[in-house]
């Protein structure tokens, strides 16, 4: 699976960062305040109230859990929370915190009301998670000093702080950890209008000339994800400078994205490979995810975390108790005739009894 994993990481429409350079690029375009943050109106409105209330009381903000598909702005929101609160932000990730001492070192160096951001928090080890519980509730941690019979537990007081946890797999969080977050927010996919605003803002920061229709052409192929929209903008900007006069119009954007093999709904080769496997190898489904993973040479987690969310959200794929099923939209997208109602396995399209 090494080559396949590499291909997944290099997808132009991958929702995860593909290189350190892209991470630096993202930081340069990242909004710095809530008022600059586009989309997620409900979450943004809630955070505005909670942050203002905490500041008026001179308290730390309640612990915040942000979850949703990758690339929607969880890290950006963590930075904005710290900046709006006027405090420092310390950033780490679940897999990095291998030992209890790793977390203890971070916690004991936090100043009053600081923000600790843990990405991929669902990947914390049980040992580290146990240390985190009293820190979240009582701002205290227990550490062991010494070894063997002489070892003893010492309780250390911590400064009040805010934990911001981010995850793409909220269902993998343990109940005790989830219950310790006072603020829980799900980030949703963006619509094309919101993404067009993000593309326009990013183009301005990059000093690129873009027409509204060009921004919308990029936005509608960005799979509802700001990270993808900004990545496509960079590639379209390159195309516009070399193959056009530098202006990003709808025609220029369309030509650039066709060159990149990104179709009108944001599908790339891997998306089409998955959907075509369901259509042609499994007669439209249902097919179990393990069989599907074997058929296209992908990891199960990649299908569930990277490929499926957008396809399901856009109505091209359905999860059923019996497996994955192609929808009528999928047949139409590939120019195929859908099964008739007497033989169809498509749920919910003709037969209300299907599940």
Curated annotation (Swiss-Prot):
Query: Which residues are listed for ATP binding in this entry?
Result: 29-30, 71, 74-76, 137-139, 180, 190, 227
Q: Which SUPFAM superfamilies match?
A: P-loop containing nucleoside triphosphate hydrolases, Winged helix' DNA-binding domain
User: Cross-referenced CDD domains, in alphabetical order?
Assistant: AAA (cd00009)
Q: Which residues form a coiled coil?
A: none
> What subcellular compartments does it reside in?
Cytoplasm
InterPro entries from the xrefs? AAA+_ATPase (IPR003593), AAA_lid_4 (IPR041445), DNA_helicase_Holl-junc_RuvB (IPR004605), P-loop_NTPase (IPR027417), RuvB-like_N (IPR008824), RuvB_C (IPR008823), WH-like_DNA-bd_sf (IPR036388), WH_DNA-bd_sf (IPR036390)
Q: Which key words tag this protein in UniProt?
A: ATP-binding, Cytoplasm, DNA damage, DNA recombination, DNA repair, DNA-binding, Hydrolase, Nucleotide-binding
Q: Which GO terms describe its biological process?
A: DNA recombination; DNA repair
Q: Does the keyword Repeat apply?
A: no
Q: Please give the residue ranges the record annotates as the region Large ATPase domain (RuvB-L).
A: 4-190
Enzyme Commission number? 3.6.4.-
The UniProt annotation puts the region (Head domain (RuvB-H)) at: 264-355
Q: What do the Gene Ontology cellular component annotations say?
A: cytoplasm; Holliday junction resolvase complex
* Annotated positions binding DNA: 300, 319, 324
Instruction: Tell me one GO molecular function of this protein.
Output: four-way junction DNA binding
How does this polypeptide assemble, per the annotation? Homohexamer. Forms an RuvA(8)-RuvB(12)-Holliday junction (HJ) complex. HJ DNA is sandwiched between 2 RuvA tetramers; dsDNA enters through RuvA and exits via RuvB. An RuvB hexamer assembles on each DNA strand where it exits the tetramer. Each RuvB hexamer is contacted by two RuvA subunits (via domain III) on 2 adjacent RuvB subunits; this complex drives branch migration. In the full resolvosome a probable DNA-RuvA(4)-RuvB(12)-RuvC(2) complex forms which resolves the HJ.
Which PANTHER family does the UniProt record give?
A: HOLLIDAY JUNCTION BRANCH MIGRATION COMPLEX SUBUNIT RUVB, PTHR42848
Role: The RuvA-RuvB-RuvC complex processes Holliday junction (HJ) DNA during genetic recombination and DNA repair, while the RuvA-RuvB complex plays an important role in the rescue of blocked DNA replication forks via replication fork reversal (RFR). RuvA specifically binds to HJ cruciform DNA, conferring on it an open structure. The RuvB hexamer acts as an ATP-dependent pump, pulling dsDNA into and through the RuvAB complex. RuvB forms 2 homohexamers on either side of HJ DNA bound by 1 or 2 RuvA tetramers; 4 subunits per hexamer contact DNA at a time.
HAMAP family in the record = DNA_HJ_migration_RuvB
Instruction: Please name the NCBIfam families in this protein's record.
Output: PRK00080.1, ruvB
Name the UniProt record assigns to this protein: Holliday junction branch migration complex subunit RuvB
């Amino acid at each position: 699976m090494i080559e396949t994993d590499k291909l997944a990481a290099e997808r132009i429409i991958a929702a995860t960062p593909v290189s350190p350079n892209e991470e630096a690029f993202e930081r340069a375009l990242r909004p710095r305040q809530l008022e600059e943050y586009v989309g997620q109106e409900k979450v943004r409105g809630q955070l505005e109230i909670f942050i203002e209330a905490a500041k008026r009381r001179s308290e730390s903000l309640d612990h915040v859990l942000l979850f949703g598909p990758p690339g929607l702005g969880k890290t950006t929101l963590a930075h904005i929370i710290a900046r709006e609160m006027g405090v420092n932000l310390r950033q780490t990730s679940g897999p990095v915190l291998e030992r209890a001492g790793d977390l203890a070192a971070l916690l004991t160096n936090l100043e009053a009301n600081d923000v600790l951001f843990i990405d991929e928090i669902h990947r914390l080890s049980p040992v580290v998670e146990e240390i985190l519980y009293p820190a979240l509730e009582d701002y205290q941690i227990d550490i062991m000093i010494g070894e063997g019979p002489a070892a003893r537990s010492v309780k250390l007081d911590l400064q009040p702080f805010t934990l911001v946890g981010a995850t793409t797999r909220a269902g993998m969080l343990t109940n005790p950890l989830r219950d310790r977050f006072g603020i829980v927010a799900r980030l949703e996919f963006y619509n094309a209008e919101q993404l067009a605003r993000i593309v326009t803002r990013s183009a301005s920061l990059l000093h690129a000339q873009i027409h509204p229709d060009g921004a919308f052409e990029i936005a509608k192929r960005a799979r509802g994800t700001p990270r993808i929209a900004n990545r496509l903008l960079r590639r379209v900007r390159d195309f516009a400078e070399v193959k056009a006069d530098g202006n990003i119009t709808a025609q220029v954007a369309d030509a650039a994205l066709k060159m990149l093999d990104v179709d009108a709904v944001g599908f790339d080769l891997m998306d089409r490979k998955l959907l075509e496997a369901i259509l042609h190898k499994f007669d439209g489904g249902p097919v179990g995810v393990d069989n599907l993973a074997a058929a296209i040479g992908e990891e199960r987690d990649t299908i569930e975390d990277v490929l499926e969310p957008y396809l399901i959200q856009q109505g091209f794929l359905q999860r059923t108790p019996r497996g994955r099923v192609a929808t009528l939209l999928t047949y139409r997208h590939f120019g195929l005739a859908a099964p008739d109602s007497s033989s169809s396995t498509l749920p919910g399209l003709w037969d209300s009894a299907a599940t």
